[in-house]
Amino acid sequence: MIIDAHNHPDWHGHDLARFLDNMKSYGIDKTWLLSWESPVDEYAPHYNYVSLSDAWGPIPFSRCLGYKERAPDKFVLGYAPDPRRPDAIDRLQAAIEIHGVQLYGELKLRMTYDNPDALRVFRFCGERRLPVTVHIDYEFDTGVKYPRPNWWYGGGIEAFERAVRACPGTTFVGHAPGFWAHISGDDQFDKVAYPKGKVLPGGKAVTMFRQCPNLYADLSAGSGLGALRRDPEFAKYFCLEFQDRLLYARDCFDNRHQEFLNSLGLPSEVLAKIYSQNATKLVAPQDR
């Protein structure tokens, strides 16, 4: 069994039919379908060309729900209302009770993730056993002033670490360049989005994995894949050490992640954990 633990509806030209065909082509049995709620001035305008945004953000929960309703056995439903909204917890609770939401994600906002409002939501997720998928990005100059000169999310790895430690009863799933750059102890994380070169000891993400049992990570997108591909020898040791807390995921529609994982020579029981067992452990998929 294979579970893609990070993807989105109507993403990069994929309507439901294309999405399901793509899953079938690569042997993917289920997908975690994540929303992205955000004020319009907190995401780059180019996302309007790769998703169907509305007043709630680039990837509305309504689109996730539409996919789930039409193919209930193929998707695990995620929803991440903006924690800064006064009704965030109420909306999430309603989505859980009415629609069977099982994930809180994707959280991708210009706020520090140790914000007290965010911590309240994270603790609620822990009580309801919803894993929390977060996107972290550092400031990189876009060359323009408007709508924003850069697109940072989360406040860096330190703010994320404080949140993870402040909410030990909540499972967090790290994702995106600002998380995966910290697989290495070098100083590239705030200089380039996708660092290259051998992984050096002392990476903050590795330290967090060893110290925070409630931290998981998905291998999605160029950031997760790139973190492994930059040093295949280290990638194998990393996957072996943290085999119980890594999730196969794509955030795209190609097969590069499977191809690379399968090339590492990992034991079949380790691949089984990464491909599906860890995801199933966090949220047992339900047909609704």
Show which residues each predicted segment covers.
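Mobile, glycine- and charge-enriched loop segments
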Residues: 1-13, 65-67, 73-79, 213-216
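Mid-to-C-terminal alpha-helical segments outside catalytic/metal-binding sites
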Residues: 1-7, 12-38, 93, 237-247, ...
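A cross-domain feature marking catalytic cores of carbohydrate-active enzymes
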Residues: 7-9, 13, 35-36, 79-83, ...
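Acidic-and-aromatic substrate-binding clefts and catalytic sites of carbohydrate-active enzymes
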Residues: 8-17, 39-41, 53-57, 82-88, ...
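Alpha-helical scaffolding within the catalytic cores
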Residues: 15-19, 58-66, 87-92, 156-161, ...
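Active-site gating loops and adjacent loop-to-helix segments of metal-dependent hydrolytic enzymes
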Residues: 26-55, 72-74, 139-144, 176, ...
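Active-site gating/metal-coordination segments in enzymes
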Residues: 44-152
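Catalytic pocket-lining loop regions of alpha/beta-barrel enzymes
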Residues: 102-103, 115-247
